Amino acid sequence: MLPLLLGLLGPAACWALGPTPGPGSSELRSAFSAARTTPLEGTSEMAVTFDKVYVNIGGDFDVATGQFRCRVPGAYFFSFTAGKAPHKSLSVMLVRNRDEVQALAFDEQRRPGARRAASQSAMLQLDYGDTVWLRLHGAPQYALGAPGATFSGYLVYADADADAPARGPPAPPEPRSAFSAARTRSLVGSDAGPGPRHQPLAFDTEFVNIGGDFDAAAGVFRCRLPGAYFFSFTLGKLPRKTLSVKLMKNRDEVQAMIYDDGASRRREMQSQSVMLALRRGDAVWLLSHDHDGYGAYSNHGKYITFSGFLVYPDLAPAAPPGLGASELL
């Protein structure tokens, strides 16, 4: 079953699911991936429902309502992609429980015949009974195109009390490190003013910080457990500004980037993801081009997100540490 799941969810899911759980732990597995293949127009604030299910391990996703209901408390990674209908804007929110908006996918480009898509992802800490779903903005100028959307989620780390064995000696603690954060303020580059340039992109909202390895105010993740990590980030584009954001390792090692120099006055979004092998002390952060004409857009809907988590810890002896804080910038 696991190979089928990995094939259907794609590379990100393969990385995130990690090692196969041991005997007796099948009840702690929870993963889903679903798709909507038909358009949907906004007429009232509504949940996005789905007509195709690729994976539903644990049966925690209800395709008819479009809701995932948490059965195993823990940290979950969610990702979704929504297609935009021609002549319409796109606004799809990741919602927890009744009305807690966690992140947003948005595109207001309304050129005739334009078919586009926007993606978003976030890791959330869920309790038993929490629900997570997608909501399409209810105003008539918003709509999903065809194909409409995909929505996936999976348990990365079960809470410690959830995965404790019922019998036998306690298992050694599982190496864990994960974070997910958002920024609710836009960022505008400027050539004026004093102060250091090329600072990490800071965040003001923290969804998850397992292990305490991410400093939201500084915008830096520092590796505590050597191993393979998955990182994803999404940013909104300011109208008439160039979007240029790089995923950095340590001081000047560019790992991945997103870029859009379109002159449109409409707000749009871009996403990127990558897997990195990190040593203890390595720093990972986002760098926004800090000059006139550049910028990134966000608001309370949380357009800007940044997530990362340990997939596989190293089994070999630890390598020398990476850069210290004073050497990063």
Curated annotation (Swiss-Prot):
Record's GO cellular component terms: extracellular space
Assigned keywords, A-Z: Cytokine, Repeat, Secreted, Signal
Keyword set includes Signal: yes
Sample GO molecular function, one term: cytokine activity
Region forming the signal peptide: 1-16
Domain C1q stretches: 25-162, 172-317
Ranges annotated as spanning the membrane: none
Classification via Pfam families: C1q
Main location: secreted
Localization of this protein: Secreted
Gene Ontology BP annotations: cell surface receptor signaling pathway via STAT; gene expression; positive regulation of interleukin-6 production; positive regulation of interleukin-6-mediated signaling pathway; positive regulation of non-canonical NF-kappaB signal transduction; positive regulation of tumor necrosis factor production; reduction of food intake in response to dietary excess
Transmembrane among keywords: no
Induction note: Up-regulated by IL6.
Positions of the UniProt region annotated as Disordered: 164-195
InterPro entries noted in UniProt: C1q_dom, Cerebellin_Synaptic_Org, Tumour_necrosis_fac-like_dom
UniProt cross-references to Gene3D superfamilies, sorted A to Z: 2.60.120.40
Expression across tissues: Widely expressed at low levels. Highest levels in adipocyte tissue and brain.
Oligomer and partners: Homomultimer. Forms trimers, hexamers and high molecular weight oligomers.
Function noted in UniProt: May be involved in the regulation of the inflammatory network. Its role as pro- or anti-inflammatory seems to be context dependent. Seems to have some role in regulating food intake and energy balance when administered in the brain. This effect is sustained over a two-day period, and it is accompanied by decreased expression of orexigenic neuropeptides in the hypothalamus 3 hours post-injection.
Protein name from the UniProt record: Complement C1q tumor necrosis factor-related protein 4
Annotated source species: Homo sapiens (Human)
Taxonomic lineage from the root: Eukaryota, Metazoa, Chordata, Craniata, Vertebrata
Gene behind the chain: C1QTNF4
